[in-house]
Amino acid sequence: MEKIRRGYYQGINPDDFSEVGTVIRLFPDAILCMDTALRYYGYSDRTPGDWHLAVSKDSGKSRFKIDYPFVKPYYVEPAVLELGLTTGTMDGHAIRIYDKDRLICDCLRYRNKMDKEIFNKAIQKYIADPEKSIPKLMEYAGPLRVKKMTKDLIGVWL
């Protein structure tokens, strides 16, 4: 057994150890977002050093102060937390993750906190993605307060 944090233990079998398994057990209410989701969808070729997690702004802050795995929480209004939520699979584990359209809205929202190269590549790959949904993107942009920016930045490419 390995102690992850006070009250959190994990059995170690080198064959079935997965960092994503640890993250989803520690933070079952969290949603993968930003750099982690960009990597999942292939919009970024960089592997993030931290797990980027969206959580309710009402959730406790201290639970994210752990030594491993490295996590970067994004505190989101509860009203829009589950907007664009979908599920996926990573390393054999079911994950909660934002869909591509919500992800791009978040990138626009946090563009000043992101690496510019990652931001630009994410936008370009989204535009080239045949599975993108511009109506859904615009639907999410309203409640996330990035509608004008979405029209200005994404509209140029269409």
Where are these regions (language model features)?
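Nucleic-acid-binding surface
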Residues: K3, Y8-L158
